Regions:
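Catalytic cores of glycan-processing enzymes that make or break glycosidic bonds
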Residues: 1-138, 143-146
């Protein structure tokens, strides 16, 4: 089990995607971790700086996308991301805080929160990294791309 939110203490960290062995599962975070946006907001200066350097980007929205790409593109046999990470939601959407008895397991994906754009983002990433059947992206100016 490789949790990307645990990865950014330095280049030798076993949770960094370049350290993975194929027979593992990669997660952006688990039900016991903050969302990717919440993690980034709360990360210490050194951890955030290393994550930005490793992922080649900065800013919460860019980091969210980079974490999803890093996980999808890793050699992990499976990749799992919370819907909150695809939606870019912050700590208010965290599922569980270990050791806290109240207020956990309340987050719900409400109708209208997703749509064709999100479905296309997920399909595009999973297809690009070979995690679902590949189909070419339409090219503008061609028969399929109008």
């Amino acid at each position: 089990m490789k949790v990307l939110e645990f990865a950014f203490s330095g280049p030798d960290n076993a949770y960094l995607p370049h350290q993975y062995q194929p027979r593992c599962v990669c997660y952006t975070g688990t039900h016991d971790n903050d969302t990717a946006a919440g993690w980034y907001a709360a990360a210490g200066e050194q951890e955030r700086a290393f994550a930005e350097r490793y992922l080649g980007t900065s800013g919460a929205e860019n980091i969210r996308q980079a974490l999803l790409r890093a996980g999808q593109g890793s050699v992990a046999e499976l990749f799992v991301a919370q819907m909150q990470d695809y939606l870019g939601l912050g700590s208010e959407s965290r599922i569980n805080v270990p050791g806290v008895a109240e207020g956990n397991w309340r987050w719900r994906l409400l109708p209208g929160r997703t749509g064709p754009e999100l479905a296309e983002e997920i399909r595009s990433l999973t297809s690009l990294y070979g995690r679902c059947p590949w189909r070419p992206e339409p090219v503008e100016g061609t028969e399929d791309g109008e």
